[in-house]
Structures are given as C-alpha cells and as structure tokens.
C-alpha cells in the first residue's frame, strides 16, 4: 500500500474544496485533493449549478427567438428537444473542467481519484477505481464532499420514468408532461426550464407559498410568471406513493389527488455526501440529512478536521461554498483570510431570475423596524426596453429615519448581477450605508444599474 504525507488533504474538488485548496496553497502548504471523479469540479460543475444554468440560458435564448417578432423574418418558431439543448451544457462543463484543472496544476496540488474514508484523525484511505488502496497522512483535513438529492426509500429511482436533479441530466427525450415534486429553488428552476421548452409542468409544493424565504412580492411574481408559462402549481400537497408505469408515472397525493405524467422529477431536499467517509472512525456525527456540524471556524468536533460547502448545510450555494472553503483553509494556515460566511446574496435562476440580500418586508414588520420601500419597474428602464426584457423590478428597503439600506430584492433579467451593487453599499460602515448614495451617484445610461437611482428617488418621495 502506497503512503503519502501532506500538510493538508481536501476531500472534494467542488467550490468548497477548490476554495480551500487555492487558499492553503498560497501559504506554501503541501496539498492533495481527493475526488471520486477523474476530473475536478464536483457536483456543482458536473450535475448542479453549471449544467442547470447553461440549460436555462439556452432555453431563454429559445424563448427569445420564438417570441420576438423580429426573428420571424428569419423563420417560424422552432421546437427544441431537451437532449439537444443539453449539448450546450456539455460544452460549458468541458470548459469549466479545463479551467479548474489548470488552477490545481499551477498551484502544484496533487490529485487522487477514488473514494476516501478516514482511518483515524490523521489518515484517510483512498480506494481507486481499479481497486487499489492508497493511504494519505496529513496534519489537517477539509471535508468538502458536497451533497446529492435526497431519495426517500419508498420511491423507486431505478424506474426509467423517475428522476432526481442529478439523473435528469441523462434524460434522453422530451416529455410532454412532467411532474416536479418539490418547489424549492431547484424545483422552481427546472419548472422554468421545462416549461420554456413547451413541457406541461405540474409543480407540487409541500408548503403554501413558493420559496417562502423570499420577499412576498417577489414570491408572488414568481408564481405569476410560472403560471403564465403553463406551470400548474399545487400548494400544501404531500406524496402518498409513486406508481411507475411503462409509459409514465402516477403520483398519488395524500389529499386524494392523482396526477399522471410522462416522468417525475424529484426535487425535495438534499443530503450530505458523508456516508462513505468513515466518520464514525474519528467520532464525527452527522444529522438526519448527512450534514456535518461545524463551529464558526468551520471546524468539526475533531480539532484538525474542517468541513465546508453543501456538506454542512445552509446556505447550500456554490458562491458561499467557495468562501467557506477558503475560510476553513484560512483557519488552517492562520491567516487573515478567515471570515464566517453569512453575507450571502440569494441567486435563483428561474425565468425571470431572482436575487436578494438582507431583510424582507415580513421580517422588518415583525421586528417593528420603521422602513420604507423604493421600487424601479424594469418596464420603464431604457436598457430593459432595448433588450426586450421588460419583466421585473428592483426593490430597496430602507430605514425611514437613517436611510440605511436594509434589504435589496430584484426580480427580472440580470437580477443576480444587479443585486451586488446593493450588497456593496450595504456592507459599508455606519453612515456610508445610505440610500443617498444612489441619488448622488452618476450611473451609466442606459444600464440596468440605473434602476437603483430610480428606486431611491421613488423611496425618498414616500417620506414625509
């Protein structure tokens, strides 16, 4: 058995693993990463963020071609199959893998392929695809193995008509009707993607409101636009059982309803990839969803083992995972690059997309904070009119007395880009976080960023 010695070993090469590896390598640590795939990137690159967002972009282009009258001079509206659209995602994945492989190579980071499990607090064994066993000994470890779709034991995911958010990327046909169970972020994003391809979608929500953590107005707007695109949303429903057929699937709900479709996409929760790590050998416990508990330093119950990314739960975003991994490594190398990641904007890539940061109206009302609202509707913005993207708005919540910005909520094209301007101002200390910044700053014209100025004036006009 080959034995290798390192300062730090990182399990996983997704955003959290990459963030940890790059930061630790900058401080001269001898590093190795372990991944079950022969290529880097983790589930984010191969099954999650990258393919789903590439799919969304392609579908958005199809919608633009089919609905913009200008394109009728070129030809009639076209129908595209899901497998054809998926090819664009494959190209993006290949480019991402090439880029990220270069990061590891330039930083002289050793890579091992296989399944890693802890032998003790200083040792992991890696079983390679060929069955060989290699042993890695290190002073510090970072668990960044990510997550996978949660699969209830009473649902047969081996049935050819039953998919989860990983296996849906192997769908070889375009269903006429699709049931999506679970109306969280992933469920809503795929509802947008498939409905944009003309698929009739039944979106089953176990709660009474879509994405209830959002501002109510934004959640309502999402519901409206999904319904406007022929998505049937069923709230407060839970499954009784799933019946697989040769030509489809029937979803039996506890309410007594039965829904038949060509396929079922299960999007109800995720579980941490911890079951094969041998955590019991080092005394690390996980919760019912396989997630590892960490402190504010991203340290587990074992002092030399850290964890970051989806494997620790909230917020389960690629952006946060990278910073969490970087912060975990910052603690290992005792640098000032550490911070607890809690200032995280929400980015939801539905059609139209959604992004927000800070408090929403319900939270501010419950806290009895005197706030006011400023809005800018995209239909009145010159840039949105030029790009033919009139749907959406920017909403700024601010303190009536101090003008401190308390929350920014955006719905529409480029929402996930627009929100960062508000985030930057909200992070300024003291009186520098003020609505006045937007009225005293000259924005390029025409731009979507100008919506901040419009919303700020709208909010100030409400004061008396």
Curated annotation (Swiss-Prot):
Annotated EC: 1.6.1.1
Residues that, per the record, bind FAD: 35-44
What GO terms in the biological process aspect are recorded for it? 2-oxoglutarate metabolic process; NADP metabolic process
State a GO cellular component annotated for this protein: cytosol
The reactions it catalyses are: NAD(+) + NADPH = NADH + NADP(+)
Q: What is the predominant subcellular site recorded for this chain?
A: cytoplasm
Q: Which InterPro entries match?
A: Class-I_Pyr_Nuc-Dis_Oxidored, FAD/NAD-bd_sf, FAD/NAD-binding_dom, FAD/NAD-linked_Rdtase_dimer_sf, Pyr_nuc-diS_OxRdtase, Pyr_nucl-diS_OxRdtase_dimer, STH_gammaproteobact
The record's comment on cofactor binding reads: Binds 1 FAD per subunit.
Q: Which cofactor is essential here? A: FAD
Where, per UniProt, does this protein localize? Cytoplasm
GO MF terms listed in the record are: dihydrolipoyl dehydrogenase (NADH) activity; flavin adenine dinucleotide binding; NAD(P)+ transhydrogenase (Si-specific) activity
Q: Name one Pfam family in it.
A: Pyr_redox_dim
| UniProt entry keywords in alphabetical sequence | Cytoplasm, FAD, Flavoprotein, NAD, NADP, Oxidoreductase
According to its UniProt entry, what is the function of this protein?
A: Conversion of NADPH, generated by peripheral catabolic pathways, to NADH, which can enter the respiratory chain for energy generation.
Family indicated by similarity: Belongs to the class-I pyridine nucleotide-disulfide oxidoreductase family.
Q: Name the PANTHER family for this protein.
A: DISULFIDE OXIDOREDUCTASE, SOLUBLE PYRIDINE NUCLEOTIDE TRANSHYDROGENASE
Protein's name in the database: Soluble pyridine nucleotide transhydrogenase
Q: Which gene encodes it?
A: sthA
């Amino acid at each position: 058995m080959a034995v290798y010695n390192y300062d730090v070993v990182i399990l996983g090469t997704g955003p959290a693993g990459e963030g940890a590896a790059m930061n630790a390598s900058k401080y001269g640590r001898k590093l190795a990463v372990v991944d079950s795939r022969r290529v880097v990137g983790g589930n984010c690159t191969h099954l999650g963020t990258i393919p789903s967002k590439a799919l969304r972009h392609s579908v958005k282009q199809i919608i633009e071609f089919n609905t913009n009258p200008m394109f009728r001079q070129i030809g009639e509206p076209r129908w595209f199959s899901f497998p054809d659209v998926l090819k664009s995602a494959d190209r993006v994945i290949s480019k991402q893998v090439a880029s990220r492989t270069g990061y590891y190579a330039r930083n002289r980071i050793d890579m091992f392929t296989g399944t890693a499990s802890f032998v003790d607090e200083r040792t992991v064994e890696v079983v390679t695809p060929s069955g060989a066993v290699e042993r890695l000994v290190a002073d510090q470890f970072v668990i960044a193995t990510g997550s996978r779709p949660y699969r209830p034991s009473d649902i047969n995911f081996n049935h050819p008509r039953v998919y989860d958010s990983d296996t849906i990327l192997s769908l070889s046909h375009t269903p006429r009707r699709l049931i999506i169970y679970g109306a969280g972020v992933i469920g809503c994003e795929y509802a947008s993607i498939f409905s944009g391809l003309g698929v009739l979608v039944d979106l089953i929500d176990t709660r009474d409101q879509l994405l209830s953590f959002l501002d109510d107005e934004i959640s309502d707007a999402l519901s409206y636009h999904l319904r406007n695109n022929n998505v049937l949303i069923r709230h407060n429903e839970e499954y009784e059982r799933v019946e697989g057929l040769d030509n489809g699937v029937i979803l039996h709900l506890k309410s007594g309803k039965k829904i038949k479709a060509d396929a079922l996409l299960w999007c109800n929760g995720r579980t941490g990839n911890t079951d094969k790590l041998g955590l019991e050998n080092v005394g690390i416990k996980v919760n019912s969803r396989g997630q590892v508990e960490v402190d504010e330093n991203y340290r587990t119950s074992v002092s030399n083992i850290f964890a970051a990314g989806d494997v620790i739960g909230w917020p389960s975003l690629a952006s946060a995972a990278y910073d969490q991994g970087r912060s975990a490594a910052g603690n290992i190398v005792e640098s000032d690059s550490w911070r607890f990641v809690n200032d995280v904007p929400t980015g939801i890539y539905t059609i139209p997309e959604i992004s927000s940061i800070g408090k929403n109206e319900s939270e501010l009302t419950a806290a009895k904070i005197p706030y006011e609202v400023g809005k800018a509707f995209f239909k009145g913005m010159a840039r949105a009119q030029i790009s033919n993207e009139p749907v959406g708005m920017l909403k700024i919540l601010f303190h009536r007395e101090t003008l401190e910005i308390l929350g920014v909520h955006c719905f529409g094209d480029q929402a996930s880009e627009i929100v960062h301007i508000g985030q930057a101002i909200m992070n300024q200390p003291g009186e520098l976080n003020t609505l006045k910044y937007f009225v005293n700053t000259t924005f390029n014209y025409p731009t979507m960023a100008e919506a901040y100025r419009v919303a700020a004036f709208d909010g100030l006009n409400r004061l008396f």
